[in-house]
Curated annotation (Swiss-Prot):
Keyword Cytoplasm recorded: yes
Null allele phenotype: Deletion of cpxR in the CG43 strain significantly decreases expression of cpxA and cpxP. Increases mrkA and mrkH transcript levels. A double cpxR-cpxA mutant in the CG43 strain activates expression of pecS and pecM. Increases production of the major pilin of type 3 fimbriae MrkA as well as that of type 1 fimbriae FimA. Increases mannose-sensitive yeast agglutination activity and reduces biofilm formation in the CG43 strain. Increases promoter activities of fimA, fimB and mrkA, decreases ryhB and cpxP, but has no effect on fur.
GO biological processes: cell adhesion; regulation of DNA-templated transcription
GO cellular component terms given for this protein: cytosol; protein-DNA complex
PROSITE patterns: OMPR_PHOB, RESPONSE_REGULATORY
Protein name in the entry: Transcriptional regulatory protein CpxR
Length: 232
C-alpha cells in the first residue's frame, strides 16, 4: 500500500482528502504545516501532497529543505492563478502542481501517474535486462537506479527530471512533442497554460554540466517540442 503524506493547514480539506485517498487504497499521513511534515517524512513515504500557503513553514520552504535529503515525489497544491508559486515550486524540484479547487478524479490520476513512474524504476532494479543504460556524450543514464552520471559524477536529479531526460535520450536527435512528454512523464494531458514540462527542461539545463563535444543538451522547437541534441 502506497503511503502519502498530505500537508495542508485546511483541516476540513485534509479530512475530506484523507477520506478520498483512504477509499482509493492509499495509506495517508496528515500534517498541517511544514514543520510537522518534515518531522513525519521518512523513506517509507511514497509521495507528498504539499500545500504552498501554510503557517510556521510554508510549502516552498518545506520543499527546499526536504530536497536537501529526499527525492520523494512531490505534487504542490497551489491557489488558482498563483503562477509564481507554481514556477518556484517546479524550480525547486516539485514533480507537478495542481491548482485549487481541483477535481478529485484528477488528483487521484496525477498521484497514480507519478507512482507508476516510481514503480517502473523499482521494477527495473529487479529485472535483469530492464531498460538499457543510455550514454550521450559523457552522460550515462541508468534507469534501474534512476541514476544520471556525468564523467563519473552523480547528478542530483528528481525522479521526474530523470524520467524526462531518459525519454529524450531514447529519442536522441528527434523532436518529442510537449504533449507526448506531458503524457509520458507526468501522466496528464497538456493544457494551454501548463508550463510544467518547460520548467523541468529548464531545471535540466541548469543541472547538467557543459557537454564535452560543445553541443547544447536540448533544442526548443517552438510549436513542435524538444529534442536532445546528438553528437553528429
Amino acid at each position: 500500500m502506497n503511503k502519502i503524506l498530505l500537508v495542508d493547514d485546511d483541516r476540513e480539506l485534509t479530512s475530506l482528502l484523507k477520506e478520498l485517498l483512504d477509499m482509493e487504497g492509499f495509506n495517508v499521513l496528515v500534517a498541517h504545516d511544514g514543520e510537522q511534515a518534515l518531522a513525519l517524512l521518512d523513506d517509507s513515504v511514497d509521495l507528498l501532497l504539499l500545500d504552498v500557503m501554510m503557517p510556521k513553514k510554508n510549502g516552498i520552504d518545506t520543499l527546499k529543505e526536504l530536497r536537501q535529503t529526499h527525492q520523494t515525489p512531490v505534487i504542490m497544491l497551489t491557489a488558482r492563478g498563483s503562477e509564481l508559486d507554481r514556477v518556484l515550486g517546479l524550480e525547486l524540484g516539485a514533480d507537478d502542481y495542481l491548482p485549487k479547487p481541483f477535481n478529485d478524479r484528477e488528483l487521484v490520476a496525477r498521484i497514480r501517474a507519478i507512482l507508476r513512474r516510481s514503480h517502473w524504476s523499482e521494477q527495473q532494479q529487479t529485472t535483469e535486462a530492464g531498460s538499457p543504460t543510455l550514454e550521450v556524450d559523457a552522460l550515462s543514464l541508468n534507469p534501474g537506479r534512476q541514476e544520471a552520471n556525468f564523467d563519473g559524477q552523480t547528478l542530483e536529479l528528481t525522479g521526474t527530471e530523470f524520467t524526462l531526460l531518459y525519454l529524450l535520450a531514447q529519442h536522441l536527435g528527434q523532436v518529442v512533442s510537449r504533449e507526448h512528454l506531458s503524457q509520458e512523464v507526468l501522466g496528464k494531458r497538456l493544457t494551454p497554460f501548463d508550463r510544467a514540462i518547460d520548467m523541468h527542461i529548464s531545471n535540466l539545463r541548469r543541472k547538467l554540466p557543459e557537454r564535452k563535444d560543445g553541443h547544447p543538451w536540448f533544442k526548443t522547437l517552438r510549436g513542435r517540442g524538444y529534442l536532445m541534441v546528438s553528437a553528429s
